[in-house]
Swiss-Prot record:
The lineage of its organism: Bacteria, Bacillati, Actinomycetota, Actinomycetes, Micrococcales. Residues 555-565 have a biased composition (Polar residues). Keywords: Cell membrane, Membrane, Transmembrane, Transmembrane helix. The keyword Membrane applies. It is found in: Cell membrane. PANTHER family: UPF0182 PROTEIN SLL1060. It holds the Pfam family UPF0182. This is UPF0182 protein Mlut_14990.
Length: 1047
């Protein structure tokens, strides 16, 4: 087959037909080039215009016959309006984002992402569109001289139907594909920025000797680029082939043969050559990807990968390049034979060398001697996994695991026994709500937070929560977005000490807030930014305007509320009409334009969840799901942990975050961490001010290469941790989600010997939560703890291990390990991090241990006859017994379990109160009203332990609610509550004809009313004067709307 006679050689133009002069040299690349001259149609009959797919064609009459009717003016108007509305919606989203980031001071983050995405969209979109357009142009310009005659009848009909809209299609298809390619490429903006700003890791991989950052930054970028180029070549090649086929340059003969014109052959040959070159590059990159594989029991390149897959990938890469050269030879010679043979050889090589050979090596060489051959690669997996997850410096201690008890055994364990957490943050949320909510427009989270504070010179573990705003969606727009805008105050209880009646011992409570910890005068109590804040609030007013925001009750028992006006800089201004219109479109709220409550001084607060705010200003970070509030330097600050992560670290085992971070407390909660990682660092500590929403990002792990790369991208968004105040450092703790990831991996990777790791006979599991019926992991617990060998106690995050749970095997629920992470970062100095922060300590018990695990300890509790009898008594009167968190403590050479037992009476206004404490050491069980008594039962009558100061009054009889609160206000509330309950139960007994029961309830009613009267007298006369409200607060107008609680 010949390429024609226009200019000689493969790029010469084909002969013209009828009326042409010389042939095929008008373009710089001859007939094949996109700018080469096209053959003219026969004569000047107007069937086709001059060369190029966009030239005019045919007579005016012919064009007139093919032209469709014009759309009506109404249709054009509707289309124009729809387009304008769509563009305005897009504009408002971008414009409001600019306002939001600008107000926070993070415009660098916004514009960097926008410019990166925009550049990728343009580059990738134009690249795809240009390639497809050139393919279409080339194929159309070099169609046969009589395309209609060359094509079959069916294709001729398609040509005629396409002709009126041919120019639109030939332009539209490249544009649509370009937009799609550009939109897809935008998702790789962070990959590109990381590649361009990477810094060396400083450690080489064990197989190729390349810096580890090559695998985390360079290899993903190269994969992205090669994948994009392959897509471009494939899409443009297929598009060009379709046009060639449509216009007869590629024809399938009736006998089964295929005829291709020289120009089409050149086009297809060069496309295939480029495609194979890119495949060769892809094969070469596959060599490096073997170090990131996650197949089998171990991660990374194993024996078969190193000795079969990597060499064969190199062979396939060279073969692909050679076959690409054969396709170039096809273009030059016009012969397909060699290129087709080369393609067959490549396919066979891929099947035999790329697939069969590694399979044979694995099955017949590796499997019979797997332990020996894989040993060095397992060592790589162990070392690199421990490096990637920060497990390379775990302090391991062999622990005796004693089970025998004797008097005085806990005499030297004051640091642990004095800080035992008896308040369960998962159970007492309802207690917080009943005793400290005060208004239906306030709420507390389901699970409370754990932190520590210094009170009277001593550091105490505490249970705490912010009193957040809670407004029902059924409320009016004014109520939801301008009246109920914020919560009020922190509520803090001692984690170890218990008040009378089994209720929390408050360190900060009431409204106005007061207590040993602080008062309203010591910090700004208003919570405008929290977990439960409305989607947006409009706040602020001109100077002198009346306050409209519902602030707080004047006192805890007052029916009158104060009003308040936000005075900070917390959100973009909506003081002008354009901004109001933009936000009205963004939130679908025309009230922002129409309401008189929006004025020239108004600000709009939105994206108010602390984790979401950090996620927006630091899109390169994975944000922890458990931000917690702390009073820091006179402000409530949400402390948020954030991580740099990667799934490209060589030889490291990957984890699905959504699976390993789920436990009995986080199950079913959103948002949960998502994605797969095999590298993680707690590189950033962030704070979000609860009053004005300001965000600060601190580079916590400034040695992390990933964080250093992102600091190059965003040089002004991160601050050094040396700028953290001493007060903030005192409340930093070890991050919970990262600890969950680490404890999961350490269950296998505490084994560092390759042979033992291969046998997998010492793998551990995180125990199931013994207080739950379903099989779900026990959560880690924060507590102040002094580990064996530790110089002084530290606020730590802890978890335990039992032997690995395997399907079909009998579970042995004994304790194999205990893990703690030191969380004290403060030193009392600004910007100075404690040296021991983050140290992981692992206690390993003997494999022959009989120390029960948490599940077995719970079973021992449940099967104890004395415990069962006492619990049955507590269940009388329709009361519900609730098991609190199972605390595990390494003391006296063994393991001590402590579990608080709560009782909750039936009824919607009751709450759990601590009634008993369960304790076990070895197989001995103690069950008493106080921790001290329970310990003494276990340790032969005198444990020698120092426990928290007892502040419990005599507990009520079983079935009764506690009636001895710690403050006058609580006394009144509890007395009225019990009076209401006695009245209700008395009526029920009367209806049943139970006169004796009715008489008992009448006695309860009279006693409760006496206590209520006494408390009311105390409030009216001898009670301490209420603190004055802040100067800016004033009584709320009586006409202020009342909220409906959201339940």
């Amino acid at each position: 087959m010949s390429f024609g006679q226009g200019g000689g050689g493969p790029f010469g133009g084909p002969p013209r037909d009828g009326g042409g002069t010389a042939g095929g040299q008008s373009g710089p690349f001859g007939a094949f080039g996109p700018f080469g001259g096209a053959p003219r149609g026969p004569g000047d009959d107007g069937d086709r215009g001059p060369g190029g797919p966009f030239g005019g064609g045919g007579s005016s009459a012919a064009r007139g016959r093919g032209r469709p009717g014009r759309p009506s003016a109404l249709v054009l108007t509707i289309i124009a309006v729809a387009v304008l509305v769509g563009l305005f919606v897009v504009f408002t989203n971008v414009y409001t984002d600019v306002l939001w980031f600008s107000q926070l001071g993070f415009t660098e983050v916004f514009w960097t992402e926008v410019l990166a995405k925009g550049a990728l969209f343009l580059i990738a979109g134009l690249g795809m569109a240009l390639a497809v357009w050139l393919a279409i142009r080339t194929a159309w310009r070099h169609r046969p001289a009589d395309a209609s005659a060359a094509a079959r009848d069916s294709l001729s009909q398609v040509q005629r139907q396409l002709e009126p809209i041919r120019r639109l299609v030939f332009l539209g298809v490249p544009l649509v594909l370009g937009v799609f390619a550009g939109s897809t490429a935008m998702n790789g903006w962070n990959t590109v920025l990381l590649f361009l700003n990477q810094v060396p890791y400083g450690q080489a991989d064990p197989e190729f000797g390349l810096d580890l950052m090559f695998f985390m930054a360079t290899l993903p970028f190269l994969t992205l680029v090669v994948g994009y180029l392959i897509s471009v070549v494939l899409v443009s090649g297929i598009t060009g082939l379709l046009v060639h086929y449509l216009y007869g340059a590629v024809r399938v003969e009736e006998g089964g043969g295929v005829r291709i014109t020289p120009a089409a052959r050149a086009h297809i040959g060069i496309t295939l050559a480029v495609f194979l070159l890119l495949q060769g590059v892809n094969f070469w990159l596959n060599r490096y990807r073997t170090t990131q594989s996650q197949t089998g029991n171990w991660a990374g390149a194993l024996y078969t990968d190193v000795n079969a897959v990597i060499p064969t990938s190199a062979i396939l890469a060279v073969t692909a390049v050679i076959v690409a050269g054969l396709f170039v030879w096809t273009v030059v010679s016009g012969r397909w034979r060699l290129s087709l043979i080369g393609t067959a050889v490549l396919v066979i090589t891929a099947l035999v060398v790329g697939t069969a050979y590694p399979f044979i090596v694995q099955e017949y060489q590796v499997k019979p001697s797997e332990r020996t051959l894989e040993s060095q690669y397992i060592e790589r997996n162990i070392a690199m996994t421990r490096e990637a997850y920060g497990l390379d410096d775990v302090e391991v201690t062999n622990y005796e695991g004693a089970t025998d008890t004797e008097a005085g055994a806990l005499a030297g364990e004051e640091a642990n026994t004095a800080n035992v957490r008896l308040m369960d943050p998962n159970l007492i949320s309802q207690t917080f709500g009943q005793l400290q909510q005060f208004r239906p427009y306030y709420s507390f989270p389901t699970t409370l937070h754990v932190d520590r504070y210094e009170v009277d010179g001593q550091t105490r573990d505490t249970i705490l929560a912010a009193r957040d705003v809670n407004v029902d969606d059924s409320q009016s727009w004014v109520n939801r977005h301008t009246i109920y805008t914020h919560g009020y105050g922190m509520v803090v209880a001692d984690a170890s000490e218990v008040a009378a009646g089994g209720r929390p011992q408050w360190l900060l409570s009431e409204i106005p807030t007061r207590g040993p910890l602080a008062s309203d005068q010591d910090y700004e109590p208003r919570i405008y930014f929290g977990h439960n804040s409305p989607s947006y609030s409009v706040v602020g007013a001109p100077e002198g305007a009346p306050a409209v925001e519902r602030d707080r009750p004047q006192t805890a028992d007052s029916q009158e509320d104060t009003a308040y006006t936000f005075s900070g800089d917390g959100g973009p201004s909506v003081g002008n009409l354009f901004n109001r219109l933009a936000y009205a479109v963004k939130f679908g709220s025309p009230e922002l334009v129409l309401s008189s409550d929006v004025n020239e001084a108004s600000q709009i607060l939105y994206d108010r969840d602390p984790a979401e705010r950090v996620r927006k200003v630091a899109p390169y970070l994975t944000v922890d799901t458990a931000p917690y509030p702390a009073i820091v330097d006179g402000r409530v600050q949400w402390i948020v942990d954030a991580y740099t992560t990667s799934d490209q670290f060589p030889y490291s085992t990957a984890q699905q975050l959504g699976e390993v971070t789920v436990d009995s407390l986080s199950q079913g909660q959103n948002p949960a961490l998502q994605g797969r990682v095999n590298y993680i660092r707690n590189s950033v500590k962030a704070t979000v001010d609860a009053y004005d929403g300001s965000v600060s990002l601190y580079a916590w792990d400034d040695q992390d290469p990933l964080l250093q790369a992102w600091q190059n991208v965003y040089p002004s968004s991160l601050r050094p941790y040396s700028e953290m105040s001493a007060g903030l450092l005192d409340h930093v703790r070890y991050p919970e989600d990262m600890f969950k990831v680490q404890r999961e991996l350490l269950g296998r990777y505490h084994v560092t010997d390759a042979d033992d790791f291969y046998e997998n006979n010492d793998a551990w599991s995180v125990p199931s939560d013994p207080t739950r019926e379903e099989d779900v992991k026990q959560p880690p617990y924060y507590m102040t703890l002094q580990m064996p060998g530790q110089d002084e106690p530290a606020f730590s995050l802890t978890s335990s291990y039992i032997p690995q749970i395997t399907d079909g095997a009998q579970q042995r629920n004994v304790l194999y390990g205990f893990l703690s992470a030191a969380g004290d970062a403060g030193t009392g100095e600004d910007g100075v991090k404690a040296e021991g922060y983050g140290q992981l300590r692992l206690l390993e018990l003997p494999r022959s241990t009989t120390v029960p695990g948490p599940g077995q300890a719970q079973a021992n509790f449940d099967s104890n006859a004395d415990v069962s009898r006492e619990l049955n008594l507590l269940r009388q009167g329709a009361s519900e017994v609730l098991n609190g968190n199972m605390i595990t403590l390494p003391v006296a050479g063994g393991i001590l379990y402590v579990q608080p037992v709560y009782v909750r009476s039936s009824g919607g206004t009751t709450y759990p109160t601590l009634r008993k404490v369960l304790v076990s050491f070895g197989d001995k069980v103690g069950f008493a009203d106080t921790l001290q008594e329970a310990l003494d039962q276990v340790f032969d009558g005198d444990s020698g332990a120092v426990t928290p100061e007892e502040k419990q009054a005599e507990a009520p009889a079983p079935g009764e609610k506690p009636t001895a609160p710690g403050t006058v206000e609580e006394e009144l509330s509890a007395a009225l509550e019990e009076a209401q309950d006695a009245l209700t139960q008395g009526q029920e007994r009367l209806a049943e004809g139970d006169w004796a029961g009715y008489g008992e309830q009448q006695k309860r009613l009279n006693e409760a009313l006496k206590r209520a009267t006494a408390a009311d007298d105390a409030l009216g006369g001898d009670a301490p004067a209420q603190e004055q409200a802040p100067a800016e607060a004033s009584p709320a107008p009586s006409s202020s709307p009342s909220p409906t609680p959201s339940g």
